[in-house]
Amino acid sequence: MSASHSLSQSPNLHPDFTYKRQEALWKQLVSAEHRKFCSCGDYTQHFRFPSPVKEDECIRVVGEEGGDGVAVSYHVTKESGDEDPEEVMASIAVGDDGDDDLELW
């Protein structure tokens, strides 16, 4: 047992909030940098958080060489809620270089 702490002392119920201060400063810096190039007001709007892949909510993408394909999860939004999976795939343009013309937000 350490000489600086004994069992008769109470635990520190008010820990140093250095980490919380550092996190708050980091968030302020990220927010300030984000405002330089975007006017949405909240940098967290650009993140999509992962969700479990459900087979009935996936589009199976098969490559040119065939195979079983890859299940690609999609999120139903108000704009795309009525779309059929085939319509979603048809709306994605694939260029000659193989890059999808999807827009990041």
UniProtKB/Swiss-Prot annotation:
Pfam families: TT_ORF2-like. It comes from the Viruses. This is Uncharacterized ORF2 protein. It comes from Torque teno felis virus (isolate Fc-TTV4).
